[in-house]
Amino acid sequence: MKGEPIEAVNVGLQSLLSALRQNPYALDSVYLSIFTFDSEIKNVLPLTALEDVTLPIISTPDSGPTFLGKMLEELVNTVQSEQILGSINQKGDWRPILILLTDGKPSDVMAYNNAIPQIKSLNFGNIVACAAGPKADPNVLKKLTNTVVSLDTMDSNSFAQFFQWVSASVAQTSVSVGASASNTLPPPPNEINIVF
């Protein structure tokens, strides 16, 4: 992802942050973390309280592999080490929400397939995967989650609509660890296609 698409992702992340910061409920309960994945896996924003987030500028190499499986493995390790589970003696974290955005297919298919059951065992409040552009394969993402959307065009408007929808989804699907809840999402805008 280069040029306008990655710039649109950065602008979209800013709009997501702005929308969440206007929600007093989110200010009290949302933490953000961002991983990037290409030939390297980077946690470019470690888990940070919403009010303390300073977004990094996301950049991508000109070409190379898409180590989605390795990123999911890193994510599993991070969630397992950082999530506070509720108990009689302490209040737990809210169930995490995973938003995955990719413009390609996993280069590490075996690692991706092995990471899927681990991700599913973490009891995410919701997992939303977005296949952005013609090189992304929604069917591969359907192995990870039933909530897969696609963006046919990777322009500023499409990404803006996607991130607005994500911010509404975060507000709607945050539920406490251990609580059962519906993972129904708000309807997406026209620029976002639900993959069945």
Stretch-by-stretch model annotation:
Residues M1-L45, V53-W94, I97-L101, N126-V140, L151-W165:
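Von Willebrand factor
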Residues K2-G3, I41-L45, S107-M110, A136-K142, ...:
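Switch/connector loops and helix/strand junctions flanking conserved nucleotide-binding motifs
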Residues L13-R21, E74-I84, N113-I116:
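Short, well-ordered amphipathic alpha-helices
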Residues D28-I58, P138-L144:
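Short beta-strand-loop
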Residues G86, G104-K143:
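VWA/integrin I-like adhesion module and closely mimicked acidic/polar interface patches used
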Residues P134-F196:
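Von Willebrand factor A/integrin I-like adhesion domains
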